[in-house]
């Protein structure tokens, strides 16, 4: 049984070779550093989290953003073929944390195309689109962006709130209440989903 599982995994990996495994490895390492820093920030209370995230922006996000700019200018948005599915997801996650509006905007079209080709999972796509809109002071579409206010997570302004779950379902996401439960567990903070904005 173990042998056949290993054989299947080896064959699957061979069927989808990455043409740039070094870039994939670099993206995964960058992602790991990013996530470790954010997990450390999640351990504090609301105010401590905000301070920690500001420090993370300086220490982690700015250098990562410089490298993402280099990658995008050299290769465009990386594909599954170039860096594998996990490499694409790592690039996307790092891009969401990048303090560079121009880069994020340039990547929107290729990310949307990759999502339609099923190279990007629904939650990663929703997070990207929503965060981009919120940073432009526009209502989000999928309800994935929350802010820390008064020591709790509050969903950012969301377009057409009553049809939110329909939009989420259309792209393969669970209802907003399920997502809120996961956020509460991860951040150990109360979660608020306003009925109206």
Positions of PLM-derived features:
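N-terminal helix-rich structural modules
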Residues: 19-137
